[in-house]
Amino acid sequence: MITVNVDLGERAYPIHIGAGLIGRTDLFAPHITGSSVTIVTNTTVDPLYGDALRAALAPLGKRVSTVVLPDGEAYKNWETLNLIFDGLLTERADRKTTLVALGGGVIGDMTGFAAACYMRGVPFIQVPTTLLSQVDSSVGGKTGINHPLGKNMIGAFYQPQAVIADIGALTTLPDRELAAGVAEVIKTGAIADAAFFDWIEANVDALNRREPAALAHAVKRSCEIKASVVAADEREGGLRAILNFGHTFGHAIEAGLGYGEWLHGEAVGCGMVMAADLSVRLGLLDEASRQRLDAVIAAAHLPVRGPALGDARYMELMRVDKKAEAGAIKFILLKRFGDTLITQAPDEAVFATLAQTTR
């Protein structure tokens, strides 16, 4: 087992990475101080790992309940969030009740948001079961739900007590979900660590084959990088925005097609292709680097052409973005691997990118 620490002073927490961790009672015990625990999971994950988690919690002598939600991005909304509150209130959960998010990014985001809101804040633990959630969404305290007009527009910054990333859970992950997680790994290397990007290029096939050593390194290095960024800029006042490389275009794709049509990581992968194209057009990135990025995204079995939503629709959707200011779209662009720039772009350049990178 490897442990990476997120250094946030009194709110610091560990990220435990390894195989078989869902069954480790000792990893949960230090973070559960109340008399009850509520597991939040979904209809796909509960049959796979719910019993193992409940067995791990049993020796703690706590009252354990489970809320099972429908599976998918399409359910990341108010109605589903209220199912969590319904479960907590039915079980008479109090301020010391610990929520445990067992699932991917949707479950983690909604459980964290429920924890931030219920009785104005209760503790929660992240147990991410997808590669995307292990390398990205479970770390850093971003929680929330989608709105029909924009992704993740309603939420809170609220840190977990711990992240327990069991890479053994990745063996049951569908191929599309695995590729979606690799997209976030690629993003992390591209924005923050050129040497890590080189490693990803050399090992993308090993990641596709789910080789345990490759997965463990990808999760570890991605978490190290994200932990350092979050520690420096917890609430996305500046530096942390670089983690949104590919997300401005990507969120537009998700909202434009309807949540769940493309996986988040698929949209981010394609969004990176689009952002790299725009980076070249603005004279920031060299063509050879753009081609390298496109190639590794394609090798991860991710889409490299965006849907034809139309220029006006893309622009409308990208203006409904957390980075936008006074309606001006801000893009995270690449200067070189490991070096980014947050900037606006002329509409003509964006239109040229859309013409080149969409169907």
Curated annotation (Swiss-Prot):
Binds 1 divalent metal cation per subunit. Can use either Co(2+) or Zn(2+). Pfam families: DHQ_synthase, DHQS_C. The keyword NAD applies. Its cofactor is Co(2+); Zn(2+); NAD(+). Its main location: cytoplasm. NAD(+) binds at residues 71-76, 105-109, 129-130, 142, 151. Its EC number is 4.2.3.4. Disulfide bonds: none annotated. Catalyzes the conversion of 3-deoxy-D-arabino-heptulosonate 7-phosphate (DAHP) to dehydroquinate (DHQ). This is 3-dehydroquinate synthase. It comes from Burkholderia ambifaria (strain ATCC BAA-244 / DSM 16087 / CCUG 44356 / LMG 19182 / AMMD) (Burkholderia cepacia (strain AMMD)).
